[in-house]
Each structure stands twice: as structure tokens, then as C-alpha cells.
């Protein structure tokens, strides 16, 4: 029977109360509410800009430290797990995550705006270089550091600790089971509000740019507020339809088509613009960005008060926007990164999208400045106060403006729809009590309606500035929460490293010498799955039964044997139950591996006749790498099980191993 709702009542209740309170204030006292929002924005700019700057630098430094330390070897999953996607496919999906409405909106607008502002000085060439530097700083590694931090925490605790893929799970080392209580609910409320306003801000940018594009290609006479409302409603209806109708595969195909169109647009501008100059600028921009990265990472313009307004209106607002988008992008990255090592994960997340961002802004930004100073004769710069229209004005100076304008509109529209569709999924995930269950259709409709109404009301009362202000306000406590998350992740990783570094014999082959002939006979016969099944039934199962009888009869322990002979990899498990701690589990499964054709055809190895060989490998409750036990007899298997049980008991007695030994299955509720 389908549940009426998957919502956590407290989380959704507090979130809706905050939203409805804000809407009521805007309707009842619009001027006072606007003044209050402006005051809050000014207060954050004046008192917390330094906090945003240092926080983002901490996120980046934290990831870099993990990547170069031994903790970077830890897998996001069990030790034997392989990545779900190939390396190239994974990089392609990270590349896709780096695309969005923001690049279309700011690709031309931001570099040109910085170029024409007083934040840059000197010759035209130096101003252009500085303009690109500031743009790349806003869209580069720092943005991906905040995404990577939350994605790493989600993936690590989700795949390594087997916890739900939820924000509250990231605080397990600090809170243990309390993540299921009121503190966990408070974490979800903060994440929900931050994500909600981050997505709504993107809706505002997308709707204004779509309206401007429709006006430019002549489909409408004016980009009015009413038109933008219509765009939001239509796009949200399409996103809700996608979310509730099970056309996810179709949306995935649309996303891939959209990425192709965006890349084609990029190539078109590169080829039709000053190609050689852009390629040279790309190299120059990379070098200039990385050589100035440390200084910019900590720059608050404390000694350049004349630029603090620019700093607040650009850098601080961007940092708040990235914080609000972190759960959204982080959850996507976490879901596709199972089986990667932490080092590999950090390299991919920080480098690949950032390099693409540098390429995008080089092609669009440098070309925009080149056009403005050349054939446009300053004509593009006249529109910097209306950034939503700049992309289309820019395309008018290149060949085929009608076609490229239409393609740009299509790309923005599809990014808009897929972002809203994914946003509904993420909001449902954060607000749900059980993350593993599908949410009923009415919840998608509710989120679509709520996002549309809030976006429209805020835009009507104060335009895009109000959307940015709300993002700035809700992102501040979430940024603080993410700092605590870093500490929690560090604590979990240290416990993980200590636990898995506990020495245990890597192999359990008992080469005592008195059975060498029988061992040699086994080695000279290529074992097949039927041989492993015989070993499990005739040797391993009697050994487990004998040990169970001793443990239950003499020591009154709760012991269970699971016979899993019918599954794809036949297996056998001995489980000793413990209250409040992880159960001890000693399993043996049939593991197959391919044999080289050269070995099969080698006349000196007549015993190798099959294309695959099978071995009985152990596996454990904590995901440690197992070992081959095919040469053990019944007594030796019992001795090996007791050796692993002794290790388990010693870890339970060690206070430092409490985190890894604590039972976590109830957290999946």
C-alpha cells in the first residue's frame, strides 16, 4: 500500500511555516518587509563577508589535505567495490554537472561587467585579464570545493557506513543515533531552506533570460514581468510532469541533447570569433587564475574600501548561492561516485568542471570584450545593466544570429526544466522521513507550486535582488553547518583509517607441512563453481554448525547460519548477534575470475582447461578485503573464524573503534 506522504512532519512543517510567514509579511507589509530584507542583506555584507571568504577557503583546503594524505586512499564504498561508472563516463557526468542556466546567463555578462567597472584598471589588455580573473575565481575551484565537500560527506557515509544518502547522515560521527531526532530534523530544515531558495534564484535568472531571448528573436514585443511569470509556470508544469509521469529516461536523453547543443554553441563562438586569440587567452587565463588563487581566496578588500560594494555584490553573493546549491549538486555527484577513492573523487570534482568553466568564460567572455571594443564600438557595454539580454545582443554580432539565438533559447529552456525536475527530487529527498521510498505524486506538485509562487512573489516585490537576498540569508547558517560537517567527516575518516589498519593475517592458508600433498593436488586442479559449492556444503557448513553449537550451548550467544547457495555467487554466513553493536559476520562466497587464454593453451599447464576459475573468499560485516580459504579443513576454518571473532571483540573493547563498531542499521528508517 502506497503511503499518503513520505514527508517528515516536523521538517516540512517548520519549512512551510517559514515560507508562509515570509509570504504573509510581503503581502501584509511589503514596504516594511523590503526594508527588513535590505537591512538583513546589508548586515550580512558588513559583518559576515569575511566568514564566507574564510569558510570557502577552509572547504578547499580541507579537500586538498584529504587528497594528498593517506586518507585519500579510502574508497567511497566497501574495499572490494568497483566504480559503478567507467572513469570517462564519470568525468562526462561531472562535466554535465558543471553546466547550467548560470553559465548561459553570466557567460557574456559577468566578464564584460567587470571589464567596464572600476574593479579593473590599467590598459585595456590588463582590464580584460583582470575581468576574466575575477569571473573565473567566482566560477572555479571554490564553487566546486563546496559542492565536493558535501558530496564527499554524503558518498562516504552513504556508501561506506551504509547510512541513508541524506544530509543528517553526514553528522553521524558526532551525533550517532541522535541524527534521527530533533537535531537531525533541524539539519534537514536548514538544508531544505538553503536548497529551496538556491533553486528559486536560478528560476528567476532563467525566466528573465528566456523572456529576453523571446523578445530578441521577435516572438514577443516586451520582456514583461507577466511574461516571466508565464515562463516560470510553464517550465514548472513541465518539470512536475516529468517528475510524476516516470519519463526520467526521456529527461536524461534531453539533458544529453542539451549538453551537445551547448557544446556546439561553444564551438560556434570559438570558430566564428577570434579563434587563435581565444586559444591563447585560454592558456593565459589558466595560468593567471592559478597564480592568483591563494591571494583571491582570502581577499576581503579590507584595505580597498572603495571596492567593498563590488565585493559584496559579486563574491559574497556567489558564495551564498553556491552554498545553497551544494545539497542539490552534491547529492547528484555523490550518487554517481560510488567505488571511487577519495583522492580520485577530489581530483575529478575540483579539476574537470573548473577547467570547463575556464574554457566557457574564455570563449564567451573574451569574445564579448573583443566585440565590444571592436565592431560593436561599445554597443554591448550599454546593456550591462540588463544582463539577461546580453547573450542575445552578443550573438547579433556573430554570423547566423537568429539560429544561434534560437539554439540558446532551447538550451536555457532545457537547462531550466531539468534543473527544476532535479530540484523537486532533491527537495523531496531532504524532506522525506524514509529516503529509500518513492514520494507520492502530489508532493512533486506541491514543490512545483511552492517554488513558482515564492519565485513570483519575491520577483514582484523586489526582482532578482530579493531572490539573491533570501539566498544570502538562508545560506549563512548552512555554511556554518558545513564547517561542522567537515569536522564530522574528518572524525569518521580517522576512525576508518585506524579501524582498517588494525593488523590481521592477510591469508589463512595453513601451510603446516603435513598436508602438502593434498594441497598440491588441489592446486593442480582448476576449481569450478561446483567444487566451491561442494566445499561450502561439506567443509564450511559443518564447521559453522560445530562452532554455533559451542557458542550457543556453552556461552548462550545468539548465532545464526545463512545458507545462500541459490544466489548468483553461492555463499555461507555465520552471524553472531550483538545488541546495539554491529553483528559479527564471517561469510564465504564463490568468487570467479577469468583465466588468460595463453595459460589455457600452455602445454606446460595441462591442469588449466577452463576460461574461468573459482575460489571461496571470505567477507566480513565491515567490508574488509577477504581471502581464499579453499585449502582449509573443518578445524582450520573454525580456527580462522575464531581469529576473526577475537579481532572483532578486541575492537569492541577499544573506545577508539566505537564509531566503526556501532550498529547503524536502524538509521535507515
Curated annotation (Swiss-Prot):
Please give the Pfam families that the UniProt record associates with this protein. Answer: BCCT (PF02028)
- GO MF annotations, alphabetized: transmembrane transporter activity
PANTHER family linked: HIGH-AFFINITY CHOLINE TRANSPORT PROTEIN, HIGH-AFFINITY CHOLINE TRANSPORT PROTEIN-RELATED
- The signal peptide, as residue positions, is none
- Location (main, coarse): membrane
Give its localization.
Cell inner membrane
Recorded superkingdom? Bacteria
Membrane-topology descriptor: Multi-pass membrane protein
**What's the protein called, per UniProt?**
Uncharacterized transporter HI_1706
Q: Which InterPro entries match?
A: BCCT_CS (IPR018093), BCCT_transptr (IPR000060)
Q: Which family does it belong to?
A: Belongs to the BCCT transporter (TC 2.A.15) family.
Query: What are the alphabetically sorted keywords of the record?
Result: Cell inner membrane, Cell membrane, Membrane, Transmembrane, Transmembrane helix, Transport
TM stretches of this protein: 9-29, 48-68, 87-107, 139-159, 186-206, 224-244, 259-279, 314-334, 345-365, 397-417, 444-464, 470-490
Q: Could you name the Gene Ontology cellular component terms for this entry?
A: plasma membrane
Amino acid at each position: 500500500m502506497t503511503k499518503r506522504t513520505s514527508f517528515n512532519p516536523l521538517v516540512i512543517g517548520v519549512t512551510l511555516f517559514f515560507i508562509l510567514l515570509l509570504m504573509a509579511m510581503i503581502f501584509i507589509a511589503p514596504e516594511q518587509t523590503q526594508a527588513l530584507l535590505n537591512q538583513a542583506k546589508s548586515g550580512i555584507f558588513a559583518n559576515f563577508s569575511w566568514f564566507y571568504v574564510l569558510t570557502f577557503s577552509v572547504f578547499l583546503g580541507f579537500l586538498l589535505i584529504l587528497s594528498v594524505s593517506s586518507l585519500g586512499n579510502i574508497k567511497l564504498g566497501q574495499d572490494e567495490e568497483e566504480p559503478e561508472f567507467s572513469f570517462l563516463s564519470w568525468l562526462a557526468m561531472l562535466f554535465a554537472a558543471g553546466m547550467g542556466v548560470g553559465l548561459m546567463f553570466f557567460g557574456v555578462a559577468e566578464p564584460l561587467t567587470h571589464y567596464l567597472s572600476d574593479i579593473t584598471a590599467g590598459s585595456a589588455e590588463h582590464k580584460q585579464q583582470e575581468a576574466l580573473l575575477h569571473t573565473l575565481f567566482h566560477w572555479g575551484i571554490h564553487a566546486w570545493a563546496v559542492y565536493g565537500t558535501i558530496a564527499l560527506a554524503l558518498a562516504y557515509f552513504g556508501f561506506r557506513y551504509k547510512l541513508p544518502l541524506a544530509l543528517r547522515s553526514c553528522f553521524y560521527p558526532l551525533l550517532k543515533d541522535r541524527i534521527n531526532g530533533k537535531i537531525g530534523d533541524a539539519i534537514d530544515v536548514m538544508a531544505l531552506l538553503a536548497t529551496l531558495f538556491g533553486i528559486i534564484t536560478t528560476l528567476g535568472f532563467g525566466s528573465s533570460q528566456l523572456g529576453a531571448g523571446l523578445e530578441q528573436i521577435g516572438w514577443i514585443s516586451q520582456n514583461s514581468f507577466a511574461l516571466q511569470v508565464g515562463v516560470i509556470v510553464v517550465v514548472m508544469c513541465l518539470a512536475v510532469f516529468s517528475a510524476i509521469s516516470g519519463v526520467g529516461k526521456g529527461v536524461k536523453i534531453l539533458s544529453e541533447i542539451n549538453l551537445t547543443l551547448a557544446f556546439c554553441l561553444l564551438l560556434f563562438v570559438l570558430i566564428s570569433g577570434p579563434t587563435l586569440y581565444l586559444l591563447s587567452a585560454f592558456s593565459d587565463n589558466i595560468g593567471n587564475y592559478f597564480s592568483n588563487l591563494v591571494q583571491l581566496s582570502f581577499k576581503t578588500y579590507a584595505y580597498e574600501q572603495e571596492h567593498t560594494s563590488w565585493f559584496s555584490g559579486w563574491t559574497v553573493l556567489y558564495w551564498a548561492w553556491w552554498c545553497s546549491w551544494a545539497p542539490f549538486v552534491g547529492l547528484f555527484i555523490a550518487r554517481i561516485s560510488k567505488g571511487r577513492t577519495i583522492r580520485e573523487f577530489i581530483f575529478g570534482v575540483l579539476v574537470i568542471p573548473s577547467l570547463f568553466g575556464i574554457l566557457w568564460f574564455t570563449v564567451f567572455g573574451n569574445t564579448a570584450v573583443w566585440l565590444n571594443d571592436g565592431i560593436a564600438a561599445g554597443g554591448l557595454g550599454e546593456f550591462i545593466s540588463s544582463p539577461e539580454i546580453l547573450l542575445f545582443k552578443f550573438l547579433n554580432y556573430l554570423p547566423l544570429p537568429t539560429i544561434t539565438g534560437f539554439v540558446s533559447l532551447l538550451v536555457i529552456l532545457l537547462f531550466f526544466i531539468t534543473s527544476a525536475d532535479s530540484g523537486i527530487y532533491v527537495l523531496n529527498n531532504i524532506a522525506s522521513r524514509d529516503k529509500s521510498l518513492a514520494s507520492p505524486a502530489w508532493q512533486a506538485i506541491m514543490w512545483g507550486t511552492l517554488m513558482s509562487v515564492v519565485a513570483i512573489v519575491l520577483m514582484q516585490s523586489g526582482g532578482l535582488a530579493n531572490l539573491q537576498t533570501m539566498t544570502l540569508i538562508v545560506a549563512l547558517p548552512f555554511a556554518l553547518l558545513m564547517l561542522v560537517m567537515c569536522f564530522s567527516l574528518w572524525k569518521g575518516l580517522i576512525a576508518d583509517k585506524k579501524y582498517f589498519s588494525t593488523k590481521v593475517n592477510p591469508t589463512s592458508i595453513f601451510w603446516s607441512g603435513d598436508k602438502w600433498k593434498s594441497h598440491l593436488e588441489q592446486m593442480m586442479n582448476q576449481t569450478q563453481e561446483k567444487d566451491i559449492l561442494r566445499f561450502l556444503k561439506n567443509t564450511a557448513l559443518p564447521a559453522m554448525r560445530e562452532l554455533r553449537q559451542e557458542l550457543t550451548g556453552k556461552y548462550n550467544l545468539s548465532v545464526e547460519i545463512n545458507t545462500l547457495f541459490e544466489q548468483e555467487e553461492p555463499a555461507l554466513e555465520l552471524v553472531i548477534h550483538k545488541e546495539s553493536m554491529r553483528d559479527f559476520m564471517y561469510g564465504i562466497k564463490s568468487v570467479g575470475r577469468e583465466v588468460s587464454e595463453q595459460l589455457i593453451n600452455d602445454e606446460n599447464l595441462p591442469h588449466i582447461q577452463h576460461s574461468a576459475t573459482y575460489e571461496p573468499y571470505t567477507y566480513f560485516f565491515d567490508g574488509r578485503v577477504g581471502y581464499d580459504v579453499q585449502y582449509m579443513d573443518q578445524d582450520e576454518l573454525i580456527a580462522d573464524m575464531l581469529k576473526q571473532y577475537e579481532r572483532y571483540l578486541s575492537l569492541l573493547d577499544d573506545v577508539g573503534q566505537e564509531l566503526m563498531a556501532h550498529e547503524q542499521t536502524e538509521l535507515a528508517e
